[in-house]
Amino acid sequence: MGDDELAEIRRQRMMQMQQQQMAEQDQIQRQQQMQAQIQSVLMQVMEPEARERLNTIRLTKPEFAASVEQQIVSLAQSGRLRQKITDEQLRQLLTQIVPQKKEFNIRRVG
Protein backbone atom coordinates (compact mmCIF):
# COMPACT_ATOMS: atom_id res chain seq x y z
CA MET A 1 0.00 0.00 0.00
CA GLY A 2 1.23 3.40 -0.92
CA ASP A 3 0.84 6.66 0.92
CA ASP A 4 -1.96 7.67 -1.44
CA GLU A 5 -3.95 4.53 -0.65
CA LEU A 6 -3.52 5.04 3.09
CA ALA A 7 -4.57 8.67 2.80
CA GLU A 8 -7.68 7.62 0.84
CA ILE A 9 -8.58 4.98 3.44
CA ARG A 10 -8.12 7.52 6.24
CA ARG A 11 -10.24 10.07 4.38
CA GLN A 12 -13.03 7.53 3.82
CA ARG A 13 -12.91 6.43 7.45
CA MET A 14 -13.04 10.06 8.61
CA MET A 15 -16.08 10.73 6.40
CA GLN A 16 -17.77 7.59 7.71
CA MET A 17 -17.18 8.64 11.32
CA GLN A 18 -18.48 12.17 10.62
CA GLN A 19 -21.64 10.79 9.00
CA GLN A 20 -22.19 8.46 11.94
CA GLN A 21 -21.74 11.32 14.40
CA MET A 22 -24.17 13.51 12.45
CA ALA A 23 -26.74 10.70 12.43
CA GLU A 24 -26.40 10.28 16.20
CA GLN A 25 -26.79 14.02 16.74
CA ASP A 26 -29.91 14.04 14.55
CA GLN A 27 -31.38 11.18 16.55
CA ILE A 28 -30.63 12.91 19.85
CA GLN A 29 -32.19 16.12 18.55
CA ARG A 30 -35.36 14.26 17.45
CA GLN A 31 -35.62 12.61 20.86
CA GLN A 32 -35.24 15.97 22.59
CA GLN A 33 -37.92 17.52 20.37
CA MET A 34 -40.29 14.65 21.06
CA GLN A 35 -39.64 14.91 24.80
CA ALA A 36 -40.27 18.67 24.67
CA GLN A 37 -43.59 18.07 22.88
CA ILE A 38 -44.60 15.49 25.48
CA GLN A 39 -43.73 17.88 28.31
CA SER A 40 -45.71 20.64 26.61
CA VAL A 41 -48.80 18.43 26.38
CA LEU A 42 -48.38 17.30 29.99
CA MET A 43 -48.17 20.91 31.18
CA GLN A 44 -51.45 21.63 29.41
CA VAL A 45 -53.38 18.62 30.71
CA MET A 46 -51.98 18.10 34.23
CA GLU A 47 -52.17 20.09 37.44
CA PRO A 48 -48.78 21.03 38.96
CA GLU A 49 -49.17 18.54 41.83
CA ALA A 50 -49.83 15.70 39.39
CA ARG A 51 -46.80 16.67 37.28
CA GLU A 52 -44.70 16.75 40.44
CA ARG A 53 -45.86 13.24 41.37
CA LEU A 54 -45.06 12.00 37.87
CA ASN A 55 -41.59 13.58 38.05
CA THR A 56 -41.00 11.83 41.38
CA ILE A 57 -41.99 8.53 39.80
CA ARG A 58 -39.64 9.24 36.91
CA LEU A 59 -36.72 9.41 39.35
CA THR A 60 -37.34 5.89 40.63
CA LYS A 61 -38.96 4.18 37.63
CA PRO A 62 -38.15 6.03 34.39
CA GLU A 63 -39.63 3.37 32.08
CA PHE A 64 -42.89 3.27 34.03
CA ALA A 65 -43.11 7.08 34.04
CA ALA A 66 -42.54 7.16 30.28
CA SER A 67 -45.35 4.63 29.84
CA VAL A 68 -47.71 6.73 31.97
CA GLU A 69 -46.75 9.86 30.03
CA GLN A 70 -47.50 8.14 26.73
CA GLN A 71 -50.90 7.05 28.00
CA ILE A 72 -51.75 10.55 29.21
CA VAL A 73 -50.61 12.09 25.91
CA SER A 74 -52.71 9.60 23.94
CA LEU A 75 -55.74 10.39 26.12
CA ALA A 76 -55.18 14.10 25.50
CA GLN A 77 -54.74 13.67 21.75
CA SER A 78 -57.85 11.54 21.44
CA GLY A 79 -59.87 14.23 23.23
CA ARG A 80 -60.88 12.00 26.14
CA LEU A 81 -59.65 14.47 28.76
CA ARG A 82 -62.26 17.06 29.66
CA GLN A 83 -60.26 18.80 32.38
CA LYS A 84 -56.76 18.87 33.80
CA ILE A 85 -55.61 15.72 35.57
CA THR A 86 -55.40 16.27 39.31
CA ASP A 87 -53.07 14.50 41.70
CA GLU A 88 -55.94 12.30 42.90
CA GLN A 89 -56.87 11.31 39.35
CA LEU A 90 -53.23 10.50 38.59
CA ARG A 91 -53.06 8.29 41.67
CA GLN A 92 -56.18 6.45 40.51
CA LEU A 93 -54.66 6.02 37.06
CA LEU A 94 -51.45 4.69 38.59
CA THR A 95 -53.30 2.13 40.71
CA GLN A 96 -55.06 0.91 37.57
CA ILE A 97 -51.81 0.61 35.64
CA VAL A 98 -49.64 -0.96 38.34
CA PRO A 99 -50.24 -4.69 38.45
CA GLN A 100 -51.52 -5.84 41.80
CA LYS A 101 -48.83 -7.64 43.75
CA LYS A 102 -49.72 -10.94 45.26
CA GLU A 103 -48.32 -11.55 48.69
CA PHE A 104 -47.45 -15.01 49.81
CA ASN A 105 -47.20 -15.90 53.46
CA ILE A 106 -45.16 -19.01 54.02
CA ARG A 107 -45.72 -20.56 57.40
CA ARG A 108 -44.05 -23.57 58.84
CA VAL A 109 -46.52 -26.05 60.20
CA GLY A 110 -45.68 -28.14 63.21
Swiss-Prot record:
The keyword Oxidoreductase does not apply. The keyword DNA-binding applies. GO terms for cellular component: cytosol. One of its GO terms (molecular function) is DNA binding. Keywords: DNA-binding. Pfam families: dsDNA_bind. It comes from the Archaea. InterPro entries: DNA_bind_arc, PDCD5-like, PDCD5-like_sf. Belongs to the PDCD5 family. This is DNA-binding protein Mlab_1482. It comes from Methanocorpusculum labreanum (strain ATCC 43576 / DSM 4855 / Z).
